[in-house]
């Protein structure tokens, strides 16, 4: 999905809070991504996966979408 500005992207990310997400940390075509839950804590976005919490800056993500 393409966004015309950062505001749209930020609103999309906010809509994913509390949901399971599929995210990628590389642009490798063979990377199938990881599944986690996007949470918000003290104003920070955290991805929880297998009981671990990852604090990841949005610019570090190559892809993020709701996992279905």
Segments predicted by a language model, with ranges:
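Short glycine-rich, low-complexity segments
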Residues: 1-32, 41-42, 46, 50-68
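Conserved glycine-centered beta-strand/turn positions repeated across beta-sheet architectures
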Residues: 36-38
């Amino acid at each position: 999905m393409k966004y015309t500005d950062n505001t749209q992207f930020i609103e999309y990310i906010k809509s994913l809070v509390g949901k399971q997400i599929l995210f990628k940390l590389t642009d490798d075509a063979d990377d199938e991504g990881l599944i986690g839950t996007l949470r918000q804590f003290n104003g920070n976005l955290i991805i929880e996966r297998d009981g671990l919490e990852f604090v990841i800056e949005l610019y570090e993500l190559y892809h993020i979408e709701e996992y279905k």
